[in-house]
Amino acid sequence: MFKNKNVLVTGGTGMIGRELVQILLDKGAKIRVASLDEPVDFFENVEFHKVDLTIYKNCEMVCEGMDFIFHVAGIKCSAEMPRIKPLNYFIPMIRFNTNMMEAAYQSGTNWFLYTSSVGVYSPAEIMKEDDVWKTFPSDNDKLPGWSKRMGELQA
């Protein structure tokens, strides 16, 4: 499915994105990564772009020519930071999710995957997917959780 296909992974230097890049490389994909973080001990044969995805033109640029887009980017922080500076997380996430979805659509790609977060759920021992809209994100993840939920609705 991915052999010789152009694949974009946003957040490809992060914990999930990096693993995804390895899987896609093993499948023979041609990978482009978009991230704010400089890659450390990164893969060869991966096209890397250090870009701010809150800027729409950057999203257009990284989406151009892609067959598949995996949007796994997020904002890394401790659970305490969104409580201290909530809008520093909520607004950029809404902006880069919206920008990426629009740029992907405008690029003509036929395949886009948006990843959410466990932060969309309220605290529970066992999280059930059907329960996500019956409750609210925990206080620790309130605005990041809501921004991911909004991304789910957009996607």
Where in the sequence are the language-model features?
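Active-site Tyr-X1-5-Lys
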Residues: 139-155
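SDR active-site strand-loop-helix element
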Residues: 10, 34, 69-73, 112-118
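Rossmann-fold cofactor-recognition segment
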Residues: 43-56
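Conserved Rossmann-fold NAD(P)-dependent oxidoreductase catalytic core, especially the SDR/UDP-sugar
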Residues: 98-141
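NAD(P)H-binding glycine-rich loop region in Rossmannoid oxidoreductase-like domains
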Residues: 53-92, 106, 123
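Conserved glycine-rich Rossmann-like NAD(P)H-binding loop of the short-chain dehydrogenase/reductase
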Residues: 29-37
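Short alpha-helix in the Rossmann-fold core of NAD(P)-dependent oxidoreductases
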Residues: 89-97, 113-116, 147-148
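N-terminal Rossmann NAD(P)H-binding glycine-rich loop of SDR-like oxidoreductase domains
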Residues: 5-27
